[in-house]
Swiss-Prot record:
CDD domains: F1-ATPase_delta. It is found in: Cell inner membrane. Its main location: membrane. PANTHER family: ATP SYNTHASE DELTA/EPSILON CHAIN, ATP SYNTHASE EPSILON CHAIN, CHLOROPLASTIC. Produces ATP from ADP in the presence of a proton gradient across the membrane. It comes from the Bacteria. This is ATP synthase epsilon chain. GO terms for cellular component: plasma membrane; proton-transporting ATP synthase complex. Keywords: ATP synthesis, Cell inner membrane, Cell membrane, CF(1), Hydrogen ion transport, Ion transport, Membrane, Transport. InterPro entries: ATP_F1_dsu/esu_C_sf (IPR036794), ATP_synth_F1_dsu/esu (IPR001469), ATP_synth_F1_dsu/esu_N (IPR020546), ATP_synth_F1_esu_C (IPR020547), ATPsynth_dsu/esu_N (IPR036771). It is a peripheral membrane protein. The lineage of its organism: Bacteria, Pseudomonadati, Pseudomonadota, Gammaproteobacteria, Chromatiales. F-type ATPases have 2 components, CF(1) - the catalytic core - and CF(0) - the membrane proton channel. CF(1) has five subunits: alpha(3), beta(3), gamma(1), delta(1), epsilon(1). CF(0) has three main subunits: a, b and c.
Length: 140
């Protein structure tokens, strides 16, 4: 079976580099699945989980806060604003960020711009969902 090379990088560091049978990523318009020989594509990512299935069928999970994904027939590059291995996420910090964002939205004043707070809430929720999916898969 053919594979594709996957690189997941953020501004801070390279998170993953290796061969894969498949990758699933949170594209702006919905999740996308990429397999070898996929048509070229360049699209934005929303906060969420990136799942990489390696040559042996083992899955690895990552969190991205957004960014872009570039797809070529045998190579995928995820350029994330922020990226982390799912197992390295801090659940307590994500819960606290969610609480603060919800509180700020509940106490907002008319005319103030809260788009940054909404973005922070979306990122915290995506981190928590990634952790929850990782826990569910670990129970299998």
């Amino acid at each position: 079976m053919s594979t594709l090379h996957v690189d997941i990088v953020s501004a801070e560091q390279a998170i993953h580099s290796g061969e894969a049978k498949m990758l699933v990523a949170p594209a702006r318009e919905g999740d996308i699945g990429i397999t070898p020989r996929h048509a070229p594509l360049l699209t934005k990512l929303r906060p969420g989980e990136v799942r990489v299935q390696d040559e042996n069928g083992e899955e690895r999970f990552f969190y991205v806060s957004g960014g872009i994904i570039e797809v070529q027939p045998h190579k995928v590059t995820v350029l994330a604003d922020t990226a982390a291995r799912a197992r390295d996420l801090d659940e307590a910090a994500a819960q606290e960020a969610k609480r603060r964002a919800e509180e700020a939205l509940a106490n907002r004043k008319a005319g103030e711009d809260y788009s940054h707070v909404q973005a922070e809430l979306a990122e915290a929720m995506a981190q928590l969902q990634t952790l929850e999916r990782l826990r569910r898969r670990a129970k299998r």
